[in-house]
Swiss-Prot record:
It comes from Rattus norvegicus. It is a lipid-anchor. Residues 2-56 are annotated as: Docking to the peroxisome membrane and binding to PEX3. It holds the Pfam family Pex19. The lineage of its organism: Eukaryota, Metazoa, Chordata, Craniata, Vertebrata. GO terms for molecular function: ATPase binding; peroxisome membrane class-1 targeting sequence binding; peroxisome membrane targeting sequence binding; protein carrier chaperone. Belongs to the peroxin-19 family. Gene3D superfamilies: Pex19, mPTS binding domain. Keywords: Acetylation, Cytoplasm, Lipoprotein, Membrane, Methylation, Peroxisome, Peroxisome biogenesis, Phosphoprotein, Prenylation. This is Peroxisomal biogenesis factor 19. InterPro entries: Pex19 (IPR006708), Pex19_C_sf (IPR038322). Residues 2-91 are annotated as: Necessary for PEX19 function on peroxisome biogenesis.
């Protein structure tokens, strides 16, 4: 009996040891299993890693990228960053002198922010850009095609202050200075004075052969030319900047009146220097078609 109990106790002990061995093996197996990867939706961002960006920041980056791409395509790559800085500087100067143009540039900026891959947004930006720059582009093109000789164009551009390294890049002052030189005393006065002096005799000899309406226009031309010459003859070396500007505006107004009256007689217009030939239309003084008098020239 005692022997039987001893055999039974040994069996129980063996079963316990086997159970412990199996449990230890299971524990080791569980430890060896790879832990599941953390869910990306609940993992906390690393402090040194990129932070979550707001929709506003994303839109701003898209606008800057669009602007950078625009300047990269418009200018050489080395001038793109300079063009951006010059554009901002030009806008500050423009806001003081031409607020209505600033409104157009604001519309242009808003359109640029909406530029996308679709044809509609690209067309909107292109249309706004053309509207904003049409006057400047039209003047520049007309001046290039006006038939002026190289010497006369060089003379007209003297004094623009476009020295090397100037870096202004502001088209508005350049166009203003160019128009002031084209309508200066040195360019216009000699020929206008000669025509004015010869006009009375020509009118007298052609009075009977010219229709009354056209003859009246020629008389008005003679009068306006005389007023322009008077403006130039009033110039003095001591004139202030305000006086120069007022005289320029007066001459510009008279030149527009002269253009409205049509071309002078060919016999008299032939006295104009080669290249100019009194072609006021080539100077585009009246601005784009459909523009009113107040918008005829950007100044």
């Amino acid at each position: 009996m005692a022997a039987a109990e001893g055999g039974c106790g040994a069996g129980v002990e063996a079963d316990r040891e086997l159970e412990e061995l199996l449990e230890s093996a299971l524990d080791d197996f569980d430890k060896a299993k790879p832990s599941p990867a953390p869910s990306p939706t609940i993992s906390a961002p690393d402090a040194s890693g990129p932070q979550k960006r707001s929709p506003g920041d994303t839109a701003k980056d898209a606008l800057f990228a669009s602007q950078e791409k625009f300047f990269q395509e418009l200018f050489d790559s080395e001038l793109a960053s300079q063009a951006t800085a010059e554009f901002e500087k030009a806008m500050k100067e423009l806001a003081e002198e031409e607020p209505h143009l600033v409104e157009q540039f604001q519309k242009l900026s808003e359109a640029a922010g909406r530029v996308g891959s679709d044809a509609s947004s690209q067309q909107e930006f292109t249309s706004c850009l053309k509207e904003t720059l049409s006057g400047l582009a039209k003047n520049a093109t007309d001046l290039q095609n006006s038939g002026m000789s190289e010497e006369e164009l060089t003379k007209a551009m003297e004094g623009l202050g476009m020295d090397e390294g100037d870096g202004e890049g502001n088209i508005l002052p350049i166009m203003q200075s160019l128009m002031q030189n084209l309508l200066s005393k040195d360019v216009l006065y000699p020929s206008l004075k000669e025509i004015t002096e010869k006009y009375p005799e020509w009118l007298q000899s052609h009075q009977e052969s010219i229709p009354p309406e056209q003859f009246e226009k020629y008389q008005q031309q003679h009068s306006v030319m005389g007023k322009i010459c008077e403006q130039f003859e009033a110039e003095t070396p001591t004139d202030s900047e305000a006086t120069h500007r007022a005289r320029f505006e007066a001459v510009l107004d008279l030149m527009q009146q002269l253009q409205d009256l049509g071309h002078p007689p060919k016999e008299l217009a032939g006295e104009m220097p080669p290249g100019l030939n009194f072609d006021l239309d080539a100077l585009n003084l009246s601005g784009p078609p459909g523009a009113n008098g107040e918008q005829c020239l950007i100044m």
